[in-house]
């Protein structure tokens, strides 16, 4: 049987560049080499694209950049693949499916998806619109509200507004403290601060504004952090739910990736059966409301006192590192990492085949 040619995209111009490298290494190591011919395509923080043929271990360390061959992804629908530029000569490598492992802006926000749509190339994950909606936490929450799905109260602040601190304090008065200040367009909890009082607000606003001109200020809830993995196109399925018990006050960037395993990942989450089922049903409702394809990790907050569930956010390219919840939840639900990757690739082909091309 002829092997499918898979291009794994990693790196990117994003604050989550390093997380992408970790996820890509894990995915490449778990793709079945008997089924797939793998092409590793890295994007530097400067936006330079390279085809990398070296040791997978050098991806996570960043050493791959020294050994990459300058490349671009296609030039038209006639050339659906990787074009390289080496020693004055061009090379062309046809690709069957692209697996974007690009977390955050310029990868998870619809930009790469738009490029791949123009090239008519099958790709893993959500389409342009759904990717963009989920990348922007404000629009995600507005979709939740429109669909009648529960999400914490919030206020939106734009860059220049942070100069008028008193106006912001008045604007968020109804939220109370603690509250969370977040960049609207970033993942992995980069730039997020839990604000306990007015004195902590200016620093939190300045930090978030480093990453985005649009900021989300959200009511703080004394909550357990619950996550559920969703897989599928028209008929998605939800995994069992897991719970994160962070080593820090909340599951921030350092707790996610650099705390040496001090945060606890409880799989399955210690929930009553009916609450577990509620999580799974709500995850699928959120997935459908956002018209998602392929995969997503749906994150919840569950009020410790009332047990009420709130949708927090949706990640269309969730982490795939060795400690990431998305593959771990599926493994505990009966799908091995390699089987999960097989299904994602098949779903990408299915989505591509369903597109209308009559014009």
From Swiss-Prot:
InterPro entries: ATP-grasp (IPR011761), ATP_grasp_subdomain_1 (IPR013815), D-Ala_lig_Van_CS (IPR000291), D_ala_D_ala (IPR005905), Dala_Dala_lig_C (IPR011095), Dala_Dala_lig_N (IPR011127), PreATP-grasp_dom_sf (IPR016185). It is found in: Cytoplasm. It comes from the Bacteria. Mg(2+) 1 binds at residues 299, 313. Pathway: Cell wall biogenesis; peptidoglycan biosynthesis. Its cofactor is Mg(2+); Mn(2+). Residues 141-346 form the ATP-grasp domain. Its EC number is 6.3.2.4. Mg(2+) 2 binds at residues 313, 315. GO terms for molecular function: ATP binding; D-alanine-D-alanine ligase activity; metal ion binding. GO terms for cellular component: cytosol. GO terms for biological process: cell wall organization; peptidoglycan biosynthetic process; regulation of cell shape. It catalyses: 2 D-alanine + ATP = D-alanyl-D-alanine + ADP + phosphate + H(+). Pfam families: Dala_Dala_lig_C, Dala_Dala_lig_N. Disulfide bonds: none annotated. Binds 2 magnesium or manganese ions per subunit. Belongs to the D-alanine--D-alanine ligase family. NCBIfam families: D_ala_D_alaTIGR, PRK01372.1, PRK01966.1-4. PANTHER family: D-ALANINE--D-ALANINE LIGASE, D-ALANINE--D-ALANINE LIGASE A. Cell wall formation. This is D-alanine--D-alanine ligase. It comes from Thermoanaerobacter pseudethanolicus (strain ATCC 33223 / 39E).
């Amino acid at each position: 049987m002829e092997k499918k040619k898979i291009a794994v995209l990693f790196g990117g111009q994003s604050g989550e560049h390093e997380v992408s490298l970790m996820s890509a290494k894990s995915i490449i190591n778990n793709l079945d080499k008997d089924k797939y011919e793998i092409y590793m395509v890295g994007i530097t923080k400067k936006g330079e694209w390279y085809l990398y043929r070296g040791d997978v271990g050098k991806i996570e360390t960043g050493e791959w950049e020294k050994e990459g061959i300058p490349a671009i992804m296609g030039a038209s629908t006639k050339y659906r693949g990787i074009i390289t530029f080496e020693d004055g000569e061009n090379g062309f490598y046809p690709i069957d499916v692209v697996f974007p492992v690009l977390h955050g802006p310029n990868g998870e926000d619809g930009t790469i998806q738009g490029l791949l749509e123009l090239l008519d190339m099958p790709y893993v994950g959500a389409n342009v619109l759904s990717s963009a909606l989920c990348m922007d936490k404000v629009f995600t929450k507005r979709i939740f509200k429109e669909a009648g799905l529960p999400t914490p109260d919030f206020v939106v602040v734009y860059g220049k507004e942070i100069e008028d601190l008193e106006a912001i304090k008045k604007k968020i008065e109804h939220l109370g403290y603690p509250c969370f200040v977040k960049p609207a367009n970033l993942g992995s909890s980069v730039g997020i601060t839990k604000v306990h009082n007015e004195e902590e607000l200016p620093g939190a606003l300045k930090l978030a504004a480093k990453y985005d001109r649009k900021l989300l200020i959200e009511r703080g809830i004394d909550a357990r952090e619950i996550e559920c993995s969703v897989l599928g196109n028209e008929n998605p399925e939800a995994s069992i739910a897991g719970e994160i018990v962070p080593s820090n006050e909340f599951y921030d960037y350092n707790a996610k990736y650099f705390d040496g395993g001090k945060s606890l990942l409880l799989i399955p989450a210690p929930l009553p059966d009916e609450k577990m089922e509620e999580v799974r049903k709500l995850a699928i409702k959120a997935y459908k409301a956002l018209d998602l394809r392929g995969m997503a990790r749906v994150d919840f907050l569950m009020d410790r006192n009332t047990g009420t569930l709130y949708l927090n956010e949706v990640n269309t390219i969730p982490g795939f590192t060795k400690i990431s919840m998305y593959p771990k939840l599926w493994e505990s639900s009966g799908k091995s990492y390699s089987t999960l990757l097989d299904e994602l690739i098949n779903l990408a082909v299915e989505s591509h085949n369903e597109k209308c091309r009559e014009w």
